[in-house]
């Protein structure tokens, strides 16, 4: 009942289009070195011992390694940072103060709080599907 459906197929031309895995892994040490250098500079700028940069790189690799990660920049990054700051400063009764401090509308503050609550909720409550 079992038949080899592709027994006569010997066309290996598709293999010529595959990337060389050895070439792919060569860029990762350079990326990690660049990340380490960036962290050393930022830690020094903040007055923290730059020797901790490698520990941070290792922690990032252990947490995010093996997966695809989107790192925002530009307006998306600015909005996310603003929302995080609003969330950190929010105490449940200071929405009006936050609108003034960050120069945004009430609606923007409420959206930021809702967004951060959703992210925190997902962090602690994984999807069941």
Curated annotation (Swiss-Prot):
Family: Belongs to the c/mor transcriptional regulatory family.
One of the record's GO molecular function terms: DNA binding
Annotated region described as Dimerization, given as residue ranges: 28-64
Keywords: Activator, DNA-binding, Early protein, Host cytoplasm, Transcription, Transcription regulation
Pfam family name, one: Mor
Domain notes: The dimerization domain in the N-terminus and the DNA-binding domain in the C-terminus are connected by a linker containing a beta-strand.
Outcome when changing residue 70 to G/I/R/S/V: Complete loss of DNA-binding and transcription activation ability
Organism domain of life: Viruses
Region (DNA-binding) residue spans: 77-129
Stated role: Activator of the Pm promoter, which controls middle genes expression. Activation of Pm allows expression of protein C necessary for late gene expression. In addition to Mor binding, activation of Pm might require the interaction of Mor with the C-terminus of host RNAP subunits RpoA and RpoH.
Intrachain disulfide bonds: none
Effect of residue 74 to I/S/T/Y: Partial loss of DNA-binding and transcription activation ability
Name of this chain's protein: Middle operon regulator
Consequence of changing residue 65 to M/N/R/T/V: Complete loss of DNA-binding and transcription activation ability
Subcellular location: Host cytoplasm
Phenotypic consequence of residue 66 to A/H/L/P/R: Complete loss of DNA-binding and transcription activation ability
Induction or repression: This protein is constitively expressed from the Pgem promoter unlike most other early proteins which are expressed under the control of the Pe promoter. Its expression seems to escape repression by repressor protein c and thus could occur throughout latency.
Primary localisation category: host cell
Taxonomic lineage: Viruses, Duplodnaviria, Heunggongvirae, Uroviricota, Caudoviricetes
A GO CC annotation given for this chain: host cell cytoplasm
Subunit structure: Homodimer.
UniProt DNA-binding residue ranges: 94-114
Outcome when changing residue 74 to R: Complete loss of DNA-binding and transcription activation ability
